[in-house]
Swiss-Prot record:
Keyword Transferase: yes
Pathway(s) where this gene product acts: Lipid metabolism; phospholipid metabolism
PANTHER family per the UniProt record, alphabetical: FATTY ACID/PHOSPHOLIPID SYNTHESIS PROTEIN PLSX (PTHR30100), PHOSPHATE ACYLTRANSFERASE (PTHR30100:SF1)
A GO cellular-component term linked to this record: cytoplasm
Record note on quaternary structure: Homodimer. Probably interacts with PlsY.
Gene: plsX
GO molecular function: phosphate:acyl-[acyl carrier protein] acyltransferase activity
Organism listed in the record: Nitrosospira multiformis (strain ATCC 25196 / NCIMB 11849 / C 71)
One Gene Ontology biological process: phospholipid biosynthetic process
Keywords assigned by UniProt, alphabetized: Cytoplasm, Lipid biosynthesis, Lipid metabolism, Phospholipid biosynthesis, Phospholipid metabolism, Transferase
UniProt family annotation: Belongs to the PlsX family.
Protein name (Swiss-Prot/TrEMBL): Phosphate acyltransferase
Amino acid sequence: MTITVAVDCMGGDHGPHVTVPATVSYLQSNPAIDVVLVGLPDVIESELRALGYTQSPRLRIHAASEVVGMDESPATALRGKKNSSMRVALNLVKSGEAQACVSAGNTGALLATSRFVLKTLPGIDRPALAVVLPTMRGHTYVLDLGANVDCTAEHLLQFGVMGATLVSSIENKEKPSIGLLNIGEEEIKGNDVVKRAAELLRDSGLNFYGNIEGNDIYKGTTDVVVCDGFVGNVALKTSEGVAQMLSHYLREEFRRNLLTKLAGLIALPVISAFKRRVDHRRYNGASLLGLRGIVIKSHGSADRRAFGFAIARAVDEVRGGMLRHISERVAQLSHQSMQSSSYRRSLPEESPV
């Protein structure tokens, strides 16, 4: 089956200067993929000419007359820009002309517009943002990263289902492990929502590891880390800040004097290998899970290489049949919940002693 990806060319800090070259580069390396470039035709065609790209049936342009700014409110984007490149790309997924949408645009606008256009899957209350982070053991998937600041225990359970299904769909892991991010491993730790979520996850039939702490994320203790969007976003931004600080300190030390500069040259192969392992561009592309279509949010400041990885993530999710697998797993969970509820109702009431 040929997979078609709709690319919001106008989104992100660099717009078509990054999205168009990144898409062309991806197409050249992946002959089984088709792409629809959505945005202002004149601008897109200008970028294609600059690349010397010749006409191909695998790439077509779909016009959209409006652009969602990176600082616009979700309400403005949703109500006032019905012909934005973001919304048109999502409509292509809704109509079946494309199997996935990739956008580097305004996160809030993409969340709101995606939910409005595509709707959530049956049994899913809220979509969640999932990202891949490097760990000592490889990588882990973390969700939610900011789509939902306030969550119920049931929402966290749904995040666990979606995260586990994402991993099993893409990486062929039959029962990926799930950790619930908490302030301690003990069952008594955490607020009422987290405690209840742990109970639901434990009874869900998923491979629930239990509570994990922040340091477990980068240890790679579990395949999936579940948390609400507030906690997840703070954890992610803190990690980014620590990485920037360490990089800054390292550069300062290597530039301190002639001897340290020489040491830096000697250590260059090791430093280069380290940078490749933690290169954030390889992990670009957050999955917006729980919708009736595949949506990938690229980082707004992504360069060409990073945006290419976001397209690749969208293709992997389509190939893995992620939407079908999530729907099936949620249906199973709903059935289990109904059976459990019926069983509890059938139990005789205890007489007071």
